[in-house]
Amino acid sequence: MADFNSPIQYLKEDSRDRTSIGSLEYDENADTMIPSFAAGLEEFEPIPDYDPTRSTSLYSQLTHNMERIAEEDDINFQHDTREFTSLVPEETDNKPEDDEESGAKPKKKKHLFPKLSSHKSK
């Protein structure tokens, strides 16, 4: 069982970056450990709730912009297929190489990684 008479101490910093020792104190009413600097927060007033009647709020502007961008991305994805067709090999790549049989010089194949192929030893 924990000894609630001795507080748990920890380091804390204030707005001026000064370090001091804070302690956690046992609150018998709440049955929880609360920081000693949190005393007096019972009167804390939260920020007022969002007013949905204001149409110029930052939230509604961001939501509208994100919806518009998502719609544009869907349109671009449906109509722009260049990145997918570039992955399909051309028909000439699938032909067997008959150049050697006809007496023509065989074509030099392009290396997949040209920068790496320029460094290979001779």
UniProtKB/Swiss-Prot annotation:
GO terms for cellular component: virion component. GO terms for biological process: symbiont-mediated suppression of host cytoplasmic pattern recognition receptor signaling pathway via inhibition of IRF3 activity. Residues 1-27, 85-122 are annotated as: Disordered. It is found in: Virion. GO terms for molecular function: DNA binding. Residues 105-122 have a biased composition (Basic residues). Interacts with the major capsid protein. Interacts with host IRF3; this interaction interferes with the recruitment of IRF3 to TBK1. Coiled coil: none annotated. This is Structural protein p14.5. Acetylated. Structural protein required for transport of intracellular particles from the assembly sites to the plasma membrane. Binds to both ssDNA and dsDNA. Suppressed the activation of the cGAS/STING pathway by interfering with the recruitment of IRF3 to TBK1, which in turn suppresses IRF3 phosphorylation, decreasing interferon production. It comes from African swine fever virus (isolate Tick/Malawi/Lil 20-1/1983) (ASFV). Keywords: Acetylation, DNA-binding, Host-virus interaction, Inhibition of host innate immune response by virus, Inhibition of host IRF3 by virus, Inhibition of host RLR pathway by virus, Late protein, Viral immunoevasion, Viral release from host cell, Virion. It comes from the Viruses. Belongs to the asfivirus structural protein p14.5 family. Induction: Expressed in the late phase of the viral replicative cycle. The modification N-acetylalanine is found at A2.
